[in-house]
């Protein structure tokens, strides 16, 4: 799971309303400073030092998001952290050169924006490329976990991971999304004035960095980041010495007793998830805990008692015809229910907005923005329109890349017919526009939900023999096309508010995407070879690989693939997901804001409760910090959380190299009953 899937991105963002963002953007002092500031040409906004910094940040965060994808699948938004690191890296570099008496190019907000865009595009491939979901769902282990004898899961319907074909798949699908809506960027950003709240919040952050007060605050954030990065890295290094065997170390510490530990209720000292909990909202973290209590505390023990009644007593713990089948399909019901509601919600909001805009135009009642437009807005629009991107380039590139995909993808996957790819690419512009428009209004990128719909359609269309592979690949095709086009509009909004040229933003996106298509497969294979990825009872569970494959099986076989009484339970949880969302949207805010998020609730159903406890620990830290020192907390929470995530995440790299070299920890720390 990622920031797009969980609440469409908005749920995991640092809460900032568009109105507040625009107020900050329009402050007289900031406006005057920007008016006096020279806006560099677009070629000066894309620098060699910036691309090196973006590559380093992209690699660091690719390692982090890959670890998160292959453990729980829950990924908080890291855009704020990436913008902070981009600022720290370049400001530190320029200060170091100044002390040495070496003249250097000034570090501008435009260069900062391009670096952040490039780095985010790079690590987005790490979690959006499907390494923990639809691509991993193609491998043999996931095929076996889904049940080799399961109807629809036909023999041979798997493809083992490979650096070559994975890189080729990403290269043939990731760039098309950048060109889909390129001719409509002015319509979405300037004419329709869509807010793109996450893009606006990132712009406000970057603009704030490049002020005298922002520079002072950044120094405090640097110290906070480095301190907690060091603590997190050293703690992870220390923990490693005690993991010399199965179920060993602090990761298996029975915090609440051995009985609770058996049901996965323990604090595992994972500072990555403590940091993630500090970034995510309290509602997300409490929803995770509620889902963990409901599933591992109540439902799974009760269903487990029906062994021999509801399902065969001979079924193994990981069999889809046993308890694991209930865990998997009920989780899917929550995800699909939440996705269905939010998909319909965004479509309705989009249609209402288009209708209202059309009605105002028809009545000639449009607000006369041109006469009252602020000088600051006029400057932004002038910069945004100055460096035009030729429309012919977008159309030609889209056609050329589409032809390449139509040829290559059926060669990679014999189950995927060439006309499946053509249909996906013909529908992409319309679907991409709907998604980008809805994202601009609601901050909910529905790319993953479009992908799930495509999964069911292609799986059912391809039939029993080819359906699973065709569904998973079709899901990846549509998701990449729709997701990336909306992300690009987010970045254009950020560039519009930071006076950054659309050309330099597009170059940053293209370079970052190219970096990601190379870095992400290499990072994935480092983990895939070093650890037992996909083991449902291990640390590297990669739960969404199995979820996506099981969704494809349902697309092929229908509800006959479900275990006994599972359909009724799935229907109940699907309805719960819809009703919970309805209650949150239509009840008075003082009641609706306490409704749990079904998408967050679903994650612990397969993964376990321990990481939810870690996330809640992070939430508790933020709550207490704001309670006793709110001003300092508002400044340092993002930096401290980023330090905790990066320190623990970076340790994964040397630990995986040690595992590949067959170097094992010297101690196994286990806990057993005293009697």
UniProtKB/Swiss-Prot annotation:
Expressed in roots. It comes from the Eukaryota. GO terms for molecular function: iron-nicotianamine transmembrane transporter activity; oligopeptide transmembrane transporter activity. It is a multi-pass membrane protein. GO terms for cellular component: plasma membrane. Induction: In root stele by iron deficiency. Disulfide bonds: none annotated. It is found in: Membrane. Residues 1-20 are annotated as: Disordered. Keywords: Membrane, Transmembrane, Transmembrane helix, Transport. GO terms for biological process: response to iron ion; seed development. The chain crosses the membrane at residues 50-70, 73-93, 118-138, 162-182, 231-251, 283-303, 329-349, 393-413, 421-441, 453-473, 507-527, 567-587, 605-625, 633-653. Belongs to the YSL (TC 2.A.67.2) family. May be involved in the transport of nicotianamine-chelated metals. This is Probable metal-nicotianamine transporter YSL16. It comes from Oryza sativa subsp. japonica.
């Amino acid at each position: 799971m990622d920031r797009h899937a969980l609440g469409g991105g908005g749920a995991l963002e640092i809460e900032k309303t568009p109105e507040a963002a625009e107020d900050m953007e329009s402050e007289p002092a900031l406006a005057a400073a920007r008016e006096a500031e020279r806006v560099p040409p677009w070629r000066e906004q894309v620098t060699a030092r910036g691309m090196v910094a973006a590559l380093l940040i992209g690699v660091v965060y690719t390692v982090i998001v890959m670890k998160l994808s292959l453990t729980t699948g829950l990924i908080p938004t890291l855009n704020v952290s990436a913008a902070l690191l981009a600022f720290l890296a370049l400001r530190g570099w320029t200060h170091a050169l100044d002390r040495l008496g070496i003249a250097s190019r000034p570090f501008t907000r435009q260069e900062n924006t391009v670096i952040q865009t490039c780095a985010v595009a790079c690590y987005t491939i790490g979690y959006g490329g499907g390494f923990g979901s639809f691509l991993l769902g193609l491998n043999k282990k996931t095929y076996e976990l889904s049940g080799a004898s399961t109807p629809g899961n036909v023999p041979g319907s798997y493809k083992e991971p490979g650096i070559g074909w994975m890189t080729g798949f990403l290269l043939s699908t990731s760039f098309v999304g950048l060109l889909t809506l390129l001719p409509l960027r002015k319509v979405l950003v300037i004419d329709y004035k869509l807010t793109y709240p996450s893009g606006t919040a990132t712009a406000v952050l970057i603009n704030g960095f490049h002020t005298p007060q922002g520079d002072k605050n950044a120094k405090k954030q640097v110290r906070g980041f480095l301190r907690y990065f060091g603590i997190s890295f050293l703690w992870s290094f220390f923990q490693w010495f005690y993991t010399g065997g199965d179920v060993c170390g602090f990761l298996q510490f029975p915090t609440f007793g051995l009985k609770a530990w058996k049901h996965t209720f323990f604090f595992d000292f994972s500072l990555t998830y403590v940091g993630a909990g500090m970034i995510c909202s309290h509602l997300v973290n409490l929803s995770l805990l509620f889902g963990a209590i409901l599933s591992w505390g109540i439902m799974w023990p009760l269903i487990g008692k029906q062994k021999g009644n509801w399902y065969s007593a001979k079924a193994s713990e990981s069999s889809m015809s046993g308890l694991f089948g209930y865990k998997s399909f009920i989780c899917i019901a929550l995800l699909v229910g939440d996705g269905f509601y939010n998909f319909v919600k965004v479509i309705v909001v989009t249609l209402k907005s288009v209708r209202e805009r059309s009605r105002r135009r028809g009545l000639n009642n449009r607000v006369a923005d041109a006469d009252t437009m602020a000088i600051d807005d006029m400057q932004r629009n002038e910069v945004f329109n100055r460096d035009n991107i030729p429309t012919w380039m977008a159309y030609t590139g889209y056609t050329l890349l589409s032809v390449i995909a139509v040829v290559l993808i059926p060669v990679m996957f014999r189950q995927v017919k060439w006309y499946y790819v053509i249909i996906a690419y013909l529908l992409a512009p319309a679907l991409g526009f709907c998604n980008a428009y809805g994202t601009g209004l609601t901050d909910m990128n529905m790319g993953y939900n479009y992908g799930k719909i495509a999964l069911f359609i292609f799986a059912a269309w391809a039939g029993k023999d080819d359906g699973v592979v065709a569904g998973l690949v079709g899901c990846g095709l549509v998701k990449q096309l729709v997701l990336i086009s909306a992300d690009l509009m987010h970045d254009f909004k950020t560039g519009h508010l930071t006076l950054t040229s659309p050309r330099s933003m597009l170059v940053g996106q293209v370079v970052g995407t190219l970096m990601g298509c190379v870095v992400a497969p290499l990072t994935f294979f480092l983990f895939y070879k070093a650890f037992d990825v996909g083991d449902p009872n291990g640390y590297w569970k990669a739960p969404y690989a199995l979820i996506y494959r099981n969704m494809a099986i349902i697309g092929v076989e229908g509800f006959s693939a479900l275990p006994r009484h599972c359909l009724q339970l799935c229907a109940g949880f699907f309805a719960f997901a819809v009703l919970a969302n309805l209650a949150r949207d239509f009840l008075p805010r003082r009641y609706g804001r306490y409704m749990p998020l079904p998408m967050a609730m679903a994650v612990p159903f397969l993964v376990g409760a321990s990481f939810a406890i870690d996330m809640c620990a992070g939430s508790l830290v933020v709550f207490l910090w704001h309670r006793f020192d709110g001003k300092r907390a508002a400044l340092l929470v993002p930096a401290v959380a980023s330090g905790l995530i990066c320190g623990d995440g970076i340790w994964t790299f040397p630990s995986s190299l040690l595992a590949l070299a067959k170097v094992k920890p010297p101690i196994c720390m286990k806990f057993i009953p005293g009697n």
